[in-house]
């Protein structure tokens, strides 16, 4: 089975410009392809994870990846799928975020001479002359076609700024530039990027008379059609300081029964034969599948040691074995206690489990908090400082969030 057939079997391919030519290129290690990453935060998240895995798979098959850091396009902001304009970031913020991205990408992709490349589109976009750009590529874009593009669809009623309207042209120019300078012949991206990607292939065809190709990756959606990779508290990050390895593990351990095998197939590197054998699993076997998914993805992102710790901590909570010391924890300072006690509301806020006293109050009143398996029945409950000595206490928020609180 070639790599193209494997990607298809894993459900990763959404749309392609020319299936036969793309199959020929990737199966024979002839694709020099890029995926763009705009630097809108200081960490990659689960939405980027699928793209990184795709790059790794294709590199293992002999193809050459280009990780394009969007130092220039981030200055504009991608309107795809947005209801409002993205927050404008400073150049310093973007440069910092780009450095964070580089460090995380190096855990997945092998960079170096003859291997993967990492480029930053700020190196060419920031120096463009506007008049020259209009003359060089402006005539290749139809405003009528651009206005019909799906990437602008959600913004047309609420207002699309001219700044954002230029995003497609900038992304297309990236492909055009790299096609000429580093032989990049293919672009991959999320299915919501299809219009922007076609802009690039068309620009290359019209300006250079040559073929370039595009393929979109299936969006990671749950059985309800919602994007995966987000929790009630926000995105699931790849940075362990933003989403702990335990919380990352728990996110995947708690996916729905209808989604677990799809996630294993799309995101892990387990052999397809092994995954196909799981298709008949049901009931308690699906819990085993969720453990496999959580462990494999945590190992990919955070390493085997952290995956083992997260799995042990989860089993301690749900199976009555192992140690709880590896779950997320907060050391409470002396100042948090008044007369040797701390209230339930303050405890939740101090541990970052609630953003405010009001949120903590509502959570307790709804019966959503337990400490050491004892439900917190009232907002007036207090805890003695002595209870937090040693391993401390385990706080349970809802059904799936656990946190350890202790004192020095």
Feature locations, PLM:
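Conserved nucleotide- and phosphate/pyrophosphate-binding catalytic cores
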Residues: 204-408
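Short acidic, glycine/serine/threonine-rich loops at helix termini
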Residues: 77-81, 128-134, 226-232
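Short, hydrophobic/aliphatic alpha-helical segments
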Residues: 28-36, 58, 65, 172-181, ...
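Divalent-metal (Mg2+/Mn2+/Ca2+)-assisted nucleotide/phosphate chemistry catalytic cores
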Residues: 10, 90-91, 97-216, 222
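Positively charged, low-complexity intrinsically disordered leader regions
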Residues: 1-33
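A charged helix-plus-loop insertion that forms the helical arch/lid used to bind
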Residues: 79-95
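Buried hydrophobic packing segments
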Residues: 51-58, 178, 196-204, 297, ...
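N-terminal catalytic cores of NTP/NDP-binding nucleotidyl/phosphoryl-transfer enzymes
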Residues: 21-79, 188-194
């Amino acid at each position: 089975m070639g790599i193209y057939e494997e990607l298809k079997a894993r459900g990763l391919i959404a749309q392609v410009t020319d299936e036969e030519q793309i199959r020929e290129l990737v199966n024979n290690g002839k694709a020099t392809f890029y995926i763009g990453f705009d630097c809108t935060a200081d960490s990659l998240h689960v939405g980027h994870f699928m793209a990184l895995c795709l790059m790794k798979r294709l590199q293992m098959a002999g193809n050459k990846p280009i990780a394009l850091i969007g130092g220039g396009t981030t200055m504009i902001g991608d309107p795809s799928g947005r209801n409002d304009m993205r927050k404008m970031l400073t150049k310093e913020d973007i440069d910092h975020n780009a450095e964070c991205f580089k460090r995380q990408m190096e855990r997945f992709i092998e960079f170096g001479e003859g291997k993967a490349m990492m480029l930053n589109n700020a190196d060419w976009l920031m120096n463009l002359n506007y008049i020259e750009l209009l003359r060089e590529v402006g005539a290749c874009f139809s405003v009528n076609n651009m206005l019909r593009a799906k990437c602008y669809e959600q913004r047309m009623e609420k207002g699309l700024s001219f700044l954002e309207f230029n995003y497609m042209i900038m992304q297309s120019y990236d492909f055009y530039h790299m096609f000429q300078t580093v032989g990049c012949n293919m672009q991959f991206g999320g299915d919501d990027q299809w219009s922007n990607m076609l802009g690039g292939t068309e620009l290359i065809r019209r300006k250079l008379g040559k073929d370039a190709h595009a393929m979109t990756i299936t969006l990671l959606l749950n059985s309800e059609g919602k994007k995966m990779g987000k929790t009630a508290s926000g995105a699931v990050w790849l940075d362990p300081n933003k989403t702990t390895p335990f919380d990352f593990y728990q996110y995947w351990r708690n996916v729905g029964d209808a989604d677990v095998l799809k996630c294993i197939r799309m995101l892990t590197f387990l052999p397809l034969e092994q995954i196909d054998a799981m298709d008949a699993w049901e009931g308690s076997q699906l819990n085993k599948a969720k453990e496999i998914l959580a462990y494999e993805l945590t190992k990919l992102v955070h390493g085997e040691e952290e995956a083992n710790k997260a799995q042990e901590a989860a089993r301690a909570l749900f199976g009555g074995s192992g140690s709880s010391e590896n779950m997320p924890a907060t050391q409470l300072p002396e100042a948090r206690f008044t007369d040797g006690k701390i209230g339930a509301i303050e405890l939740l806020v101090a541990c970052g489990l609630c953003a405010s006293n009001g949120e903590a109050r509502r959570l307790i009143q709804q019966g959503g908090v337990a400490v050491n398996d004892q439900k917190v029945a009232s907002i007036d409950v207090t805890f003695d400082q002595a209870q937090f000595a040693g391993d401390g206490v385990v706080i349970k928020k809802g059904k799936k969030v656990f946190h350890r609180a202790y004192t020095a």
